[in-house]
């Protein structure tokens, strides 16, 4: 079990014990469980806890709570660690024995539930919280009963990512399923799409759109501008099973612990590689960037392909994204988030002063690696964005490409592509351990804040249909290789369409997907555009790296003023 699944199980047991104590025993204290749950949760988040905070969490009077904590320390369930040089202040932590016992306890609960749902005990395909349809063949989409007499039309604003292309190409089908007319407005340019979403909510009149598909890193900016409606209370009353969604997808759609969108397309940035070519030259799939560069050198000498690798390097947002994702593989987000441990950073920025990391060692290394890739990349690399570099790979012109998973449809569903059924998938290679990770991208469906109040239930039901397992499967069958939910990825029919789903499911369970690489600062889009322009001059116009990164840091610092 990974950290996310343990946390979900803990929350589940918390609720069941609370229900038992309230409904059966009328005892709401349950102090020992509350202590253990509190200690384990904070340990997972690498947060310091004290004797006082544990007593407060226990629900016991202070003196009784103090005796209980001392007893648990004596029993070696908890351990003390000196916090200050004076030795008079301590932090409290779970002992290794408690962590092991607690993990085994939660695992036994998971296995019991899995067994009763028809999964074999210790079956790794069961992920706690996934839909009951997981592992089964998901049926065709069912029709939505629109009982509203007032609302017979939905207006959707989005870009042209693969999932939205499926909707637009099959409007008659979706109108039949949703029992309403659909007005689908597509804006291909991401900057223009962002501005459209913002301007729509600036108006004092009602919103022009009912649903907006927003790029995940925009959530901070859209939340700060009150552009989107917080969805938490509507989710609770609409019957959404958010636990079936990948944790990374839900977190990436949230800001300051509020949910502003429901994931419709969750896509990690991966390394695609040609298995047949790698096998031909005895190359191992690269897990580190030095291994990738070594493979590039061998492939360049072989003349097997035009270029060993392709990746997005167009000036502005595409290049900046490649840069900050590379920074993540060298162990740093582009802003100074708190490091929890391993490959995890805390997304809570309430207690820190935000600064950018463009003068960090990771930034220098990331820029240098991108520069070192240029001799192994297409001659028109500086013109390539996401679609162009995947198309290059799909035509057999490169042996590797770094890009978002959804674009795998260009070769996985194209029998004429040399990469068809010949592609392997990996998290992005590590610059330093343990950062072989893939940052999460994609789109979520949000509701404009100036929508008519009485239309919200109808719109929520529409969103629920658009992200249901049946509809997600329909997107996949029609060309969008993306699933934000566990249950669809476990459908045997879906798995036969492309090996990418098995690989993505495994990466999610192994916690290879991270949200912190593109932390959604309210000024994210402006910072990224500036950084992409500056990096372009270093990579293609030979500007000095130190000067380039100093300029990135300076321009980003000016844009951070908006946060204050």
Model-inferred region functions:
Residues 281, 375, 413-483, 514-517:
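Extracytoplasmic/periplasmic substrate-recognition and gating elements
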Residues 45-56:
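Short acidic, hydrophobic short linear motifs in intrinsically disordered regions
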Residues 117-220, 547, 555-564:
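Conserved N-terminal structural module of periplasmic/extracytoplasmic solute-binding proteins
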Residues 82-91:
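Short, Lys/Arg-rich nucleic-acid/phosphate-binding segment
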Residues 296-298, 338-383:
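Glycine-centered hinge/linker elements that transmit conformational signals in sensory
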Residues 216-269, 426:
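Hinge/lid segment of periplasmic solute-binding proteins
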Residues 1-26:
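N-terminal leader segment of winged-helix/HTH proteins
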Residues 163, 438-439, 488, 502-556:
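C-terminal capping/gating helix-and-loop segments adjacent to ligand/active sites or protein-protein/ligand interfaces
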């Amino acid at each position: 079990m990974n950290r996310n699944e343990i946390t979900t199980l803990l929350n589940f047991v918390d609720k069941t014990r609370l229900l038992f104590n309230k409904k059966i025993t009328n005892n709401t204290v349950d102090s020992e469980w509350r202590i253990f749950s509190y200690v384990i949760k904070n340990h997972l988040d690498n947060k310091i806890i004290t004797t006082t905070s544990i007593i407060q969490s226990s629900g016991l009077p202070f003196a009784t709570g103090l005796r209980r904590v001392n007893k648990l320390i004596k029993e070696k369930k908890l351990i003390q660690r000196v916090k200050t040089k004076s030795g008079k202040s301590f932090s409290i932590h779970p002992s290794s024995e408690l962590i092991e016992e607690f993990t085994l306890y939660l695992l036994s609960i998971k296995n019991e539930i899995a067994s009763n749902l028809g999964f074999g005990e210790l079956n790794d395909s069961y992920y706690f919280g996934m839909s009951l349809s997981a592992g089964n063949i998901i049926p065709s989409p069912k029709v939505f009963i629109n009982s509203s007499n007032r609302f017979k039309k939905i207006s959707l604003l989005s870009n042209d990512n693969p999932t939205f292309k499926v909707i637009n190409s099959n409007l008659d089908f979706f109108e039949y399923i949703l029992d309403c007319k659909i007005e689908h407005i597509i804006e291909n340019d991401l900057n223009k799409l962002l501005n459209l979403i913002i301007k729509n909510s600036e108006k004092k009149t009602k919103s022009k759109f009912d649903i907006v598909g927003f790029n995940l890193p925009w959530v901070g900016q859209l939340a700060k501008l009150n552009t989107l409606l917080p969805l938490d209370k509507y989710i609770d009353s609409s019957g959404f099973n958010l636990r079936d969604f990948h944790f990374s997808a839900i977190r990436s759609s949230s800001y300051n612990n509020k949910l502003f969108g429901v994931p419709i397309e969750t896509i990690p940035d991966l390394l695609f590689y040609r298995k047949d070519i790698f096998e031909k030259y005895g190359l191992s799939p690269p897990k580190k960037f030095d291994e990738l560069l070594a493979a590039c050198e061998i492939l360049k000498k072989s003349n097997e392909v035009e270029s060993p690798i392709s990746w997005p390097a167009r000036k502005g947002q595409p290049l900046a994204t490649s840069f900050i994702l590379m920074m993540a593989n060298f162990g740093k987000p582009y802003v100074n988030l708190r490091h929890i441990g391993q490959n995890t950073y805390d997304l809570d920025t309430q207690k820190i002063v935000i600064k950018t990391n463009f003068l960090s060692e990771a930034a220098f290394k990331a820029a240098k690696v991108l520069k070192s890739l240029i001799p192994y990349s297409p001659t028109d690399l500086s013109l390539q964005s996401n679609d162009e570099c995947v198309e290059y790979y799909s035509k057999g012109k490169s042996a590797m490409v770094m890009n978002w998973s959804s674009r795998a449809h260009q070769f996985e569903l194209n029998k004429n592509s040399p990469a068809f059924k010949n592609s392997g998938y990996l998290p992005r290679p590590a610059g330093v351990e343990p950062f072989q990770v893939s940052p999460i991208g994609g789109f979520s469906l949000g509701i404009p804040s100036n929508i008519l109040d009485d239309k919200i239930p109808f719109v929520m039901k529409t969103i629920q249909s658009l992200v249901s397992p049946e509809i997600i499967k329909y997107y996949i069958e029609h060309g969008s290789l993306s699933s934000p939910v566990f249950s669809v990825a476990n459908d045997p029919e879906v798995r036969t369409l492309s090996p990418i789903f098995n690989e993505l499911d495994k990466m999610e369970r192994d916690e290879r997907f991270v949200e912190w690489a593109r932390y959604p600062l309210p000024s994210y889009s402006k910072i990224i555009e500036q950084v992409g322009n500056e990096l372009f001059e270093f990579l293609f116009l030979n500007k000095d790296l130190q000067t380039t990164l100093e300029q990135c840091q300076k321009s980003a610092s000016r844009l951070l003023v908006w946060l204050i």
